[in-house]
Amino acid sequence: YIADIDRIMACKKDGEEVWAKDISDTLLKIDVQGPLAFKLLKEVYGENVLKNRYNPEKNMNFFTFNQFERNGQHYYLSRTGYTNRWGWELYIPVAVAEEDAKIIISKALDFGGLLVGLGGRDENRISAGPFGLPLMGQEYDPYHTPVNAPLFETAVDMNKEYFVGKEGLVKEIAEGVQKRLYIFVSEGIVTNRGIYKEGK
């Protein structure tokens, strides 16, 4: 896959002064998802970090980011919700990651939550059906586009004058869609394996 930083720089228009720095090695990411995610983060980090930075009377909008300082450390927070519930992705400085993770996990267990890996998160995300969000490397990758998804027209406004990738989508639609993405519900675990019918 093309690294995120390469994707960002590829969108730079001629003459624009844009720079990007990869700081991923300095951060640890924890997803806090579910109906009590807001309460948990509010108790650990305070309500202000969850506010809309452009309208502090409201909470963060879906797919927005905040930054905040805590004990001299710089954090990033994104409002997500891959499971069609309240959710955030918290980017914690490596220097305090172990300490913060222990606090978050302890608080989650106090609330009756669970500590799960990516498999558990993916199961909840897929169970959300059309409301579960796709992930890079799982449902989409450089070899698939939004056009391949059944609900493409409801998610992408092709009437919008410009967006990154529009030219490619217009071309794909004109040439005829060759692939479709679908969800298969199976019995048992079939991760990273094909789905067979009559041995094929």
Features from the language model and the residues they span:
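Conserved, structured C-terminal
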Residues: 1-200
